[in-house]
Amino acid sequence: GEQVLKGILVPHAGYVFSGSCAAWAYKLIAEAKFAKTYVILCVDHYKRCKGVSTVMDDFETVFGVAQVDKVMVQKLVDKGLVNVVDDVKEHSLEVQLPFLQHACMDNLQNLKILPLIVNDVSRIKDIAKEFGDDVCVIISSDLTHFGEDFNYVPFRYNIKKSVAEQDKNAMRFISDLDSDGFLCFVERGKITICGKKAIALGIEMFRVLDVVDVELLSYYTSSEVMHNDSNFVSYAALRFK
């Protein structure tokens, strides 16, 4: 039968940069068993939301309406675990929706999403416990942002190799489902992984979902697209089973 896919980690840059990386992961969503709810864990790039936030309003894209799982939202709100905001203008979420809808083309009418904008990690274990195994988790995060543009220049030599090595170490914590280790590693090195809090919540959800197998599907940097070696962002696609 169809494989159960517990989740993916995908980048959220413009499609021209990270689209081909994300496509590897969404291909697996298309092939896997259709989930009751797709939980999309996002970054709050504009620091507008406190704690962990979500919305009640459905989203509209070129493929039509993506319905928010309002029952699940209400459950999380009632338990004081998330708060509802009016409007999420957040590209780390918006970039994922057409990909997800396209992957679920046969089930568009039944597609339900639960976007969570993660700005705080104090209650991620409690939030994770609220989910059963009928969900698929989508973590929306790029990896290292390197260069003066990002105020992050820890390496002067062998830059690409050093960034790749560091990303590999970060991904090892993710694969080991060690959210504390991951956050400590990122904080200690002041590493510019924008979705670190979303990743930490994702890890806790994958622990609850009994993930046993994590695979790296794709990894590259924007410098391979733009040929700019002084400022670049690295992207990875991971799948969790």
Question: What positions do the PLM features span?
Answer:
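Active-site histidine-anchored catalytic micro-motif
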Residues: G1-E204, V208, S222-M226
